[in-house]
Structures are given as structure tokens and as C-alpha cells.
Amino acid sequence: MSNKIEDKGIIVLMYHRFEENKYPSTNIRMVDFIKHINLIKKNNFIFVDANNFESNLLNLKKEQKILLTIDDAFKSFYDQAWPILKNSKIPFILFVNTREVGSNGYMTWDQIKEISKEKFAHIGNHSYSHDYLVDKGEEEITNDINLAIADFKKNLGYNSPFFSYPFG
């Protein structure tokens, strides 16, 4: 990364699994994740809070901005990366596909609630099934998203304003 970025905008970095080396296409080693965070800080990038994303996007200045997102709510995020982000209060969005919550390898609703209590942490909808929705009809897509919304309301007490399309 360089301090001389000409283009204005917000860089979005997406992560999935942490220290789950048997999934190389979606995994990052913690030593590399920590290098990412340190490099971002060293180059004076600003971590964007999701609540301010729209105003940051509409009000582009010369500051270099980054939004971190984490997909799928794998337990490895909670165990490995969450303590680092929490300690540094680095803002991010955790996108949750709700059907898998509590399943083997995934976070629980209690863990997600714990994270959601932090002002810098946001929980987003990643659908219910995490299916490749392009292959579904409008009714199936609507039903899938509505199931996730119901899970959010039941377990967190609100419907998230953030949505990340599975495989999108």
C-alpha cells in the first residue's frame, strides 16, 4: 500500500476464515491478518465504521479509507480475529448466514450478540441459507431473506440494515 493513492473511494477488505488451513481459498493465517492490520495502520488508512459508510462515500476526501467485512460467522473469526479487532476497536461488519449459527464450525447467537454490543462492530445479513441465490426464483430469494430477517429479529432484536449477497 502506498500513501499516494490517486483514486478516491473506500477499499473493502473481505475475510472469511482465520487459521483454518484446510480451507485455503477462504482462510487467512493470523500472522498475515495481523500484517494486514499493521500495514493499514502504518500507511495511515482510516478504518470506516459501517454507520458512516454512506457519508464517507458521498464525502470523499484525500484520506485513504478501508472497510473490513467478515463473511459467514465462522467460529474461527470469534476465536482468532475478534480479540484483535476488539482490542484495537477496529470497525467491521460481520455478515451472518443465519441457518448455520450454532452449527459445528460457526458462531453461536450468544457470541454474535456479544460482538453486536460493541459500537464499532456491526452485524449484517448474509441470507438464511447462503445458497447461490442467482439460481433461485424471486419467491425463493424473498423467502430466504425473510427467514434471515426473522432470525435477526428473534435473536438480536432488530433487522440489520446491512446485507451482503452470498457469493456476490
Model-derived features with residue positions:
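Metal-dependent polysaccharide deacetylase catalytic core of the NodB/CE4 family, i.e.
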Residues: 8, 13-19, 63-66, 75-78, ...
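Noncatalytic alpha-helical scaffolds and linker/capping helices
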Residues: 71-73
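N-terminal pre-catalytic segment of deacetylase/amide-hydrolase enzymes
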Residues: 1-66
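Distinct, well-ordered alpha-helical segments
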Residues: 55-59, 81-82, 112
